[in-house]
């Protein structure tokens, strides 16, 4: 069953850089995806007011921009493992607007995310562990 594309999801926002608004519909999400594909805008960030917890992970936002090598879309998902500081941003290239819309619809309506095993790690914002022991000057 497909979600109601005109229903307003009040705990979600859309940010396109020049403006951000709270309370979004899937119809607005779809319009933004096609605007990116048509190169009318650079990106869209879709985020919940609070991170969504799924399988011991916190999902913070989804960002979509044009794929550099094709006329398709690039999608990124920000994930923080429970107990970790800092997010990992996963990305996937060459996605059509309907594929991306399905991922976003599942996130907004059903609090579901695809398995990210095959996705590329675009950015790892977790703090690095120190692999050395500092010498103490006060010994």
What are these regions (language model features)?
Residues 48-50:
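Generic secondary-structure microfeatures
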């Amino acid at each position: 069953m497909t979600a109601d594309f005109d229903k307003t999801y009040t705990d979600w926002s859309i940010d396109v850089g020049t403006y951000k608004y709270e309370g979004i519909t899937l119809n607005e999400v779809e319009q933004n995806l096609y605007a990116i594909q048509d190169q009318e805008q650079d990106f869209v960030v879709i985020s919940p007011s609070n991170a969504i917890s799924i399988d011991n992970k916190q999902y913070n936002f989804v960002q979509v921009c044009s794929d550099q090598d094709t006329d398709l879309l690039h999608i990124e998902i920000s994930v923080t493992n429970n107990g970790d500081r800092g997010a990992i941003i996963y990305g996937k290239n060459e996605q059509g607007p309907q594929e991306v819309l399905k991922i976003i619809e599942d996130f907004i309506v059903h609090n579901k995310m695809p398995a990210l095993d095959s996705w590329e790690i675009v950015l790892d914002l977790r703090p690095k562990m120190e692999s050395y022991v500092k010498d103490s000057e006060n010994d």
